[in-house]
Amino acid sequence: RDRVSFGMQSAVPAVLRTLDRRHDPAKLPGLVIAARQLGLDVSVDLIYGAPGESLQDWEVSLREAIAMEPNHISAYALVIEEGTKMGMQVARGELPMPDPDDEASKYEIADRLLGEAGYAWYEISNFARRESGEEGCPSTQLRHASRHNLAYWRDWDWWGFGPGAHSHVGRYRWWNVTVSY
């Protein structure tokens, strides 16, 4: 089945502002319902470790994502890249670097909550919802494990649609702009 991934990142508006994301997290449940009505599998992407994000903020985001019952959840640790807006804010001392101990705690919270909700960890940042009969199945063979992730590691082609989406076809990689005009 085809899958759509929603870049939720966080359910906490203050964290989204720190990440320079402009969407309203309250609209996502309706979009998830619409995607399911179209027959699509749903994945939700989260980012943890934003400056100022508390353990409670992260838990709220995880619980909001789990409540939508997506087939797949990615939980990525924030990486602050040199030359980006956030990288420059950190370099100027306006934002702190993520605390590795805090990030480790957030990963452990994700592993616990997602496991309790029936998601199986299969790749460093990825969790797929187990279906009936998949209890003993190797995690990389789960129905909801991401084919895109497999395609990425095997250098297969994929197309990304929407703001900031990445694509790879042949030897070419590109991404869409995130700013609307």
Question: Where are the language model's segments positioned?
Answer:
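C-terminal scaffold of the Radical SAM
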Residues: 1-181
